[in-house]
Each structure stands twice: as structure tokens, then as C-alpha cells.
Amino acid sequence: STVHRVLTRYGVARLRWLDRPTGRVIRRIESAAVGDLVHVDVKKLGKIPAGGGWKMLGQTKGGHNASVDRSSGVFNKHRQPLRGYHFLHTAIDGHSRLVYSELLADERKDTAAAFWTRANAWFNECGITVQKVLTDNGSCYRSHVFRDALGTIEHRRTRPYRPQTNGKVERFHRTLAD
């Protein structure tokens, strides 16, 4: 139509290319080659005991459910097992969308650094040399231990409170949840 030709002539973007709240054109983070940018993030997943949670068994079974899973071997300062959550650590190559993921007991700095070491070794086995890593500003990714695990790889962080920047891994976590 005529309206479309005029808008195209003046470089006006389509509505689907715009961010609804701000009206600005959405900038996409796309890497040109395999290994240019790897997105890394952690998803917190609640542990549900075998047989279901309190909605299935009733709230009176809460004490029984609390002691069901002691398999992690990780304890809090009161020597009680950390039974509330599992943490899904994920690394996704931004170009090929190749995923390395592990379900771990926590999201501490040592765990995140060890995960990255294994993920980087796995990417190397697949023939991918990682150049940059994009993470959020979580404490495990700001630590010196994680920085040392990265070595010569460039570390980029997302803007605070802006998970859309790390959208590839966020979408992967949502796909797993659905």
C-alpha cells in the first residue's frame, strides 16, 4: 500500500520490531561465528518429593516431605540438608544454539566456576573455541573464582534488572519449564 511505501522510504520500523514500552527499535545480540558469545545463567528449581508436594499430600505431611530428600549431601549451618532447590546451570552458544546444562546443588562461586570449566571443555570437544561469555550480575559470576576460571575469555555482563539481554538462555529455561 501507499502508506507502507512512505513509511519504508523514511525508515520507520515495523511495530513488531519496536519495544512496546519505549517505542525504540529492539537491538538483537547476534554472534557472527560459533563461539563468539556464550550465554550462561542459572535457573532455580524447587525440589518436589516423590509422590508430589503438599498440594497432593496435604499440609499435614509437610514434616514427612521435609525429610524425604537428603541426597545432595550439602547442609546448612544447623546441619540440616538444603532440600529446597536444585539449580540448573546452562551455557548456550549464541550462534549455533548448542547447549550444555547441568543440575547442581547450589549457585555458589565455586560451583559456577567448576560448571564453566566443564562447559568450556565440552565446547572445546565439539570444536568450539569460546571468545566471550555473557552472564548476569549474580554474585557467583562476579567472584574472583569465576574470573579465574574464565582465563583469557572476555567476560561481559548484562545490565542490572534486564534479563532480556541474556534472552537466549532465559528462553531455554522457559522452554524447559513449559
Feature locations, PLM:
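Basic, flexible linker segments flanking DNA-binding modules
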Residues: 1-61, 139, 148, 159-165
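RNase H-like DDE/DDD metal-dependent nuclease/strand-transfer catalytic core used by mobile genetic elements
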Residues: 47-51, 57-178
